[in-house]
């Protein structure tokens, strides 16, 4: 049943690498680094065979293996069935108050591909990127496994 991957539709915006480089230098120096995740069920790991096989934990594991000298803290604020509208309303309490150094956001499957979710997603990005702790922010877009659809077009607009 799979759906072909349309690499032509995929979008990559490298943006400014300053914050991620600073975060990695902090880890290289052996300083503590907090790695946070915000999203829906994919982030929560609801279809993973174990909590250790969800993408968020695997990214955390990469940080631990890449920077063994640093104390890496894992903060998974994924809640299944939620959208960026709920994400922007809870990001402060569930993630930002913990002062993460690195944040990965994923709502591409639960957000609809329309202007409303473009606005709520943009609000979420502005809130996380504009936080006083200046975290590195990485945005990820997955696709639905049943039909290959995501909100990537709106999120990238």
Question: What are these language model-derived features?
Answer:
Residues 1-37, 43-50, 60-70, 97, ...:
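N-terminal secretory targeting modules
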Residues 76-78, 108, 141:
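Residue-level recognition of beta-strand->loop/alpha-helix junctions
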Residues 117-124, 152-155:
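Charged helix-capping and loop-helix junction motifs
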